Amino acid sequence: MVRNLKTLKNKIKNTGIFGHFSYGKIWQEKEGGEQNDWYNVMHESHKIQHQDFIQYLKTRKNLETVLEVGCGTGVYPIKLKELFSNIKYTGIDISETAIKQCKKNSSFEFLVGDFIKLNISKKFDLVYSHAVVDHVYDMDAFVAKIVDVTKKYAYITAYRGFFPDLKKHKMNWNDADGSYYNDFSIIQIKKKFKEIGLNENEFDIKSLKVDNKNENADYQIVIKIEKTN
């Protein structure tokens, strides 16, 4: 009993949800045109990242189902919907107002909720997520969930910099935004991949040089996963 309690305490300590009841505030408060404008600015500020992903998406074969984690107001399924002309797209976002915008402007499937906690019964040929892991309360659980719900491919980006020597994830809570601003540890996520059964030849972690005009982070992290069985 004592050992189980200690394990639970360590688990809570190593995530960031405990005590932060305003988690997700920055995404929940915006609505309508203001919300669309905000997501469009975010998308435009990561052009190189998105270009890399689009090229990656176009070279994947036999994709029938795709899941986007953190779809926002739907830049991909609405403005870039031609990418999914022959694919069943599903988008997930924690913001109820963002998902309302998606459903209003697209016939694709959309789900609202905390991806880490959502019960997702089906698996997808490709799961991708842009600049979401930088803000979640449990980075390992977030990435592990993506690995779990993909049949074959996953593409994950972290935009706050490339930290090859960082031994553990670094989490910084911003109370005004109701969000974390995380530094993503490549060393720690490699350990997590091994723990959940991914072989070294099934994932690739690289730095992507970007033109961050308003940020000091000139490099971003791109994780590409391809399951072999």
Region annotations inferred by a language model:
Residues 1-58, 63-72, 155-183:
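Conserved class I S-adenosyl-L-methionine
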Residues 73-115:
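Class I SAM-dependent methyltransferase SAM/SAH-binding core
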Residues 128:
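A conserved beta-strand element that flanks and buttresses the S-adenosyl-L-methionine
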Residues 131-135:
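Short catalytic micro-motifs in class I SAM-dependent methyltransferases
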Residues 141-154:
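A short glycine-rich, Lys/Arg-flanked "PGG" loop and its adjoining helix->strand segment in the class I
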Residues 179-197:
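Short alpha-helix
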